[in-house]
């Protein structure tokens, strides 16, 4: 996938091409060729950094496809972002302690108050880096498909 968004112009980023490929091509291919549980309730999407931004956009655009959402240093969800909370089984938000952990923690508080199953994780002494994301994945994985 190519995208011509330049540094500092993130608002110009378009996820449409990736979303179409993922939803209309990749997921149907995987479901047709591998032993999967091809239902929304058995599907998760998570991403780190820019992949988190893509994850947020796609999960909000396609709520009938995914039930578990994970943003690893990829922003937050607000309760008003999600139109039908009955479709969402888990929202996992994480970041490094040297990023902006208060945003993640406050978002999870708001999501919980709105009735969502939401979890935050802050990786101590890390920033926007792979150690943060490895630790975050370690925390997220056991929460999926429960």
Model regions and ranges:
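Non-catalytic cap/lid and distal C-terminal segments of serine-dependent acyl enzymes
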Residues: 1-146
């Amino acid at each position: 996938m190519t995208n011509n968004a330049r540094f500092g112009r993130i608002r110009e980023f378009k996820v449409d091409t990736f979303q179409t490929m993922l939803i209309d091509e990749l997921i149907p291919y995987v479901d047709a060729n591998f032993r999967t549980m091809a239902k929304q309730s058995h599907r998760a999407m998570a991403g780190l950094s820019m992949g988190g931004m893509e994850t947020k956009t796609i999960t909000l655009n396609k709520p009938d496809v995914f039930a578990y959402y994970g943003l690893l240093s990829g922003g937050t969800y607000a309760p008003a972002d999600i139109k039908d909370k009955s479709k969402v089984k888990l929202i996992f938000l994480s970041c490094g302690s040297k990023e902006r952990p208060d945003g993640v923690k406050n978002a999870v508080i708001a999501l919980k108050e709105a009735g969502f199953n939401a979890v935050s994780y802050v990786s101590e002494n890390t920033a926007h880096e792979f150690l943060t994301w490895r630790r975050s994945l370690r925390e997220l994985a056991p929460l999926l498909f429960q």
